[in-house]
Amino acid sequence: MSLRYESIESLSQMIQNKTIRPSELIEDTFVNIEKDDTVINSFLALDKEAALEKAKTMDNETPSGKLFGIPMGIKDNIVTKDVETTCASKILEGFNSVYDATVMNKLNAENGILVGKLNMDEFAMGGSTENSFYKKTVNPFDHKAVPGGSSGGSAAAVAASLVPFSLGSDTGGSIRQPASYCGVVGMKPTYGRVSRFGLVAFASSLDQIGPITRNVKDNATVLEVISGLDPHDSTSAPVDNVDFTSQIDKDIKGLRVAVPKEYLGEGVSEEVKASVQAAIKALEKMGATVEEVSLPNSKYGVATYYILSSSEASANLARFDGIRYGYQAEGAQNLEELYKKTRQEGFGDEVKRRIMLGTYALSSGYYDAYYKKAQKVRTLIKQDFERVFENYDIIVGPTAPTTAFDIGAQINDPLTMYANDILTIPINLAGLPSMSIPCGESNGRPIGLQLIGKPFDEKTLYNVAYNYEQIFNMHERYQSL
């Protein structure tokens, strides 16, 4: 009996009822990974021995915790004490953290079992997972297509039913865009909802960790586990933990839905428009009221994001110098040369591009023209959302302007690649919660519906997503892959 297509809820019930043992589930997981991941390439490292040992110990224990015996994959920019963390970069090859990230501690406290670390764009910079130093991940729905990025391995592993859930990180769309491309459920929580302690920083004012699953309720369960105030993270918000799964199925009659006209305009493919408009009509049939609104400053989102995120990245990545950990270049004659050679050889092209862009934006004479101006535009984008949320409960639109593109099609065209995140970036700039759920397909490649909520109102997003999932879900499609 293959357990790969079962939900977290179903697997937990089976373990509780002693229909299966945790060790059987973990053994089945590794059988599937070893059989299928030679093609998908979602995992960078596996922790088979430790996972099986932990599962066998659990066989003799009374089930406790929301994730007892459940296998999980973690994006490789979230540090794990016992498994290498590389951020898919040569410069961190062989790096082993001396501690677990807060989210890992929370997952372990609920008795989840880590099976491995997942591929990504190097240092989370990219939208296709082609920027990984180690391997290229493919889209389980179409092996010629990218899985999205930067959390491409996290989305692909879940879509291929190798694990029931994974964690990704989202700085400008890096959970939601791959979730859209791979036909899975991806949540970027409100900034501060989930601790970033142990997440290797890209852009600290934008980064947020979130779950990727095959159904909405599983996603809510995982967010419940990883949420909460953390004294190790000064940006962690002092808000009460929420039971996201309770009343997840309540009806949405009277829900006020806003649809930004900019999100269905130029650049959005006809197939994506049609699927998203059909999903919006479905919400209307369920009793929601839908009105068009405007988010006029969203068009400046991509430019604003690349100035701010690259500026923060140039500072955050200064610590990788070949001295303390990771890759160290050979043949340097002095300290300055060691720094230069290590960073030149250790970082990939996209990371270098963003470091240079960020350093330029922060440099004397350009700071006011670029960085300071971008901060002002960020405020305007945030105010646009605040105005809309005075009268509406949720904003709905596409997650990405198109379906997944072919591997190799955009890797040499950074501006086109950057534009793929035009619909997700503004939400990070505003610090809001947002999720992608499947709403259609075009030529076998999935289309995602993006739901955007008020600060710390992930519960409403899950409620709407769950109701929509009852009329459109991908369960049978996962089994056909």
Swiss-Prot record:
EC number: 6.3.5.7
Recorded catalytic activity of this chain's protein: L-glutamyl-tRNA(Gln) + L-glutamine + ATP + H2O = L-glutaminyl-tRNA(Gln) + L-glutamate + ADP + phosphate + H(+)
GO molecular function, one term: glutaminyl-tRNA synthase (glutamine-hydrolyzing) activity
Keyword terms: ATP-binding, Ligase, Nucleotide-binding, Protein biosynthesis
Gene3D superfamilies from the UniProt entry: Amidase signature (AS) domain
GO BP terms, alphabetized: translation
GO CC terms, sorted: glutamyl-tRNA(Gln) amidotransferase complex
Active site, per annotation: K75, S150, S174
Organism superkingdom: Bacteria
Annotated NCBIfam families: gatA
Reported function: Allows the formation of correctly charged Gln-tRNA(Gln) through the transamidation of misacylated Glu-tRNA(Gln) in organisms which lack glutaminyl-tRNA synthetase. The reaction takes place in the presence of glutamine and ATP through an activated gamma-phospho-Glu-tRNA(Gln).
Binding partners and assembly: Heterotrimer of A, B and C subunits.
Family of this protein: Belongs to the amidase family. GatA subfamily.
Stored PANTHER family: GLUTAMYL-TRNA(GLN) AMIDOTRANSFERASE SUBUNIT A (PTHR11895:SF151), TRANSAMIDASE (PTHR11895)
Name of the protein in its database record: Glutamyl-tRNA(Gln) amidotransferase subunit A
Organism: Macrococcus caseolyticus (strain JCSC5402)
